[in-house]
């Protein structure tokens, strides 16, 4: 995928993301969103990775707690929680041919620790499906968001 394809379709990708997430906003070519499941909130950041020429899905996990009508959230880095997010009843939530390689890295744009689905997988997926333009981004988002949300 070429960078200009991503840049030209950021608004369209943000539209797809709004179907599963809240508080979706864009800043130039970076998309920020929140998704909640149970007592977990995912802080999601999507942007174009120039080296791999593919979109990159990054996220952080926040544990939500309510006590005496006060909601608090705590940043969590826990492999058990990652395993819970990407599995359902002990089985991967995505196609078994896909290894959702989730790693913890310093975010290349924000400089804070985030989990990421490795961009080489995004590049390979987009190459395999051979879609172009906004259709490729919609396919990519639906495929990988199904792992987390």
UniProtKB/Swiss-Prot annotation:
GO terms for molecular function: ubiquitin-like protein transferase activity. Its main location: membrane. It is a peripheral membrane protein. It is found in: Preautophagosomal structure membrane. Its EC number is 2.3.2.-. Coiled coil: none annotated. Keywords: Autophagy, Membrane, Protein transport, Transferase, Transport, Ubl conjugation pathway. It is an enzyme of class 2 (transferase). GO terms for biological process: autophagy; protein transport. The active site is at 120 (glycyl thioester intermediate). E2-like enzyme required for the cytoplasm to vacuole transport (Cvt), autophagy and nucleophagy. Acts as an E2-like enzyme that catalyzes the conjugation of ATG12 to ATG5. ATG12 conjugation to ATG5 is required for proper localization of ATG8 to the preautophagosomal structure (PAS). Likely serves as an ATG5-recognition molecule. Forms homooligomers. This is Ubiquitin-like-conjugating enzyme ATG10. It comes from Pichia angusta.
């Amino acid at each position: 995928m070429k960078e200009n394809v991503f840049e030209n379709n950021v608004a369209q990708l943000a539209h797809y993301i709004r179907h599963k997430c809240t508080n979706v906003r864009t800043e130039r070519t970076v998309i920020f969103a929140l998704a909640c499941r149970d007592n977990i909130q995912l802080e999601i950041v999507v942007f174009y990775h120039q080296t791999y020429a593919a979109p990159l899905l990054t996220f952080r996990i926040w544990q939500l707690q309510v006590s005496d009508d006060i909601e608090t959230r705590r940043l969590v880095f826990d492999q058990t929680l990652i395993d819970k997010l990407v599995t359902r009843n002990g089985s991967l939530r995505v196609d078994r041919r896909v290894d959702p390689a989730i790693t913890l890295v310093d975010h290349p744009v924000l400089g804070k620790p985030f989990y990421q689905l490795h961009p080489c997988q995004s590049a390979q997926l987009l190459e395999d499906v051979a879609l172009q333009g906004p259709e490729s981004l919609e396919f990519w988002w639906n495929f990988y968001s199904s792992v987390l949300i």
